[in-house]
Swiss-Prot record:
CDD domains: ADH_SDR_c_like. InterPro entries: ADH_Drosophila-type, NAD(P)-bd_dom_sf, Sc_DH/Rdtase_CS, SDR_fam. Gene3D superfamilies: NAD(P)-binding Rossmann-like Domain (3.40.50.720). It catalyses: a primary alcohol + NAD(+) = an aldehyde + NADH + H(+); a secondary alcohol + NAD(+) = a ketone + NADH + H(+). This is Alcohol dehydrogenase. The keyword Flavoprotein does not apply. Keywords: NAD, Oxidoreductase. It comes from Drosophila mimica (Fruit fly). GO terms for biological process: alcohol metabolic process. The keyword NAD applies.
Length: 254
């Protein structure tokens, strides 16, 4: 996918990996970058706008846990304004296994609902033009960090959902791939809670292992966007971008 002159919606593009990815996207010159985030960050929006004045950067407040109808209403506002959207990035995520319901609501249900909502505008069965979805999942969707089983399971669910979306592209006209960062130096991983406090030092122990910067992750994220491979499972770890070959142990046969 060519980022230049495209219209992109980025959910949770104002913090951590998201903000650095927004910076890299803006450098590539899209026509519009629409940021949907729970928390407003005027300084970051001003920075992004100044980084490339040719790009229109717009912000709308959005909590991915709102009812589906509210998400559809927000997307209608955006589509009415832009007319077309080329790429949706679902990036909302939390890491706190004390918050079981919210972890699932943000990391999985929010991705499902935002994706479901945009189908009203993209699905070729309704006369839509199709589109591209990039879902930020995690390497914990491959192999869990067992001390945070709720987080890991939510990311595995998001990965499975994304793989299914890719298989449905011939039906909907919407392609999809997953972005799976490894351990990245963000606020998210500096302090978080394990499930039932099974390992109080989980964040500290995790950071003893090699990590990557948010900039490294963001630069590889943009490479994945440009590659635009339906069904790709991208691992973004230790400053590298690698495709993952998914091992099939069972097939529904349909």
């Amino acid at each position: 996918m060519v980022i230049a002159n495209s219209n992109i919606i980025f959910v949770a593009g104002l913090g951590g990996i998201g903000l650095d990815t927004s910076r890299e996207i803006v450098k590539s010159g899209p026509k519009n970058l629409v940021l949907l985030d729970r928390i407003d960050n005027p300084a970051a929006i001003a920075e992004l706008s100044a980084l490339n004045p040719k790009v229109t950067v717009t912000f709308y407040p959005y909590d991915v846990t709102v009812p589906l109808a509210e998400t559809k209403k927000l997307l209608k506002t955006i589509f009415d304004k832009l007319k077309t959207v080329d790429l949706l990035i679902n990036g909302a995520g939390i890491l706190d296994d004390h918050q079981i319901e919210r972890t699932i609501a943000v990391n999985f249900t929010g991705t499902v609902n935002t994706t479901t909502a945009i189908m009203d505008f993209w699905d070729k069965r309704n006369g839509g033009p199709g589109g591209v979805i990039a879902n930020i999942c995690s390497v914990t969707g491959f192999n869990s960090i067992y001390q945070v089983p709720v987080y890991s399971a939510s990311k595995a669910a998001a990965l499975s959902f994304t793989n299914s979306l890719a298989r449905l592209a011939s039906v909907t006209g919407v392609t999809a791939y997953s972005i799976n960062p490894g351990i990245t130096k963000t606020v998210l991983v500096h302090k978080f809670n394990s499930w039932l406090n099974v390992e109080p030092r989980v964040a500290e122990l995790l950071l003893e292992h090699p990590t990557q910067t948010t900039v490294q992750c963001a630069q590889n994220f943009v490479k994945a966007i440009e590659a635009n491979q339906n069904g790709a499972i991208w691992k973004l770890d230790l400053g590298r971008l690698d495709p993952i070959e998914w091992t099939k142990h069972w097939d529904s046969g349909i």
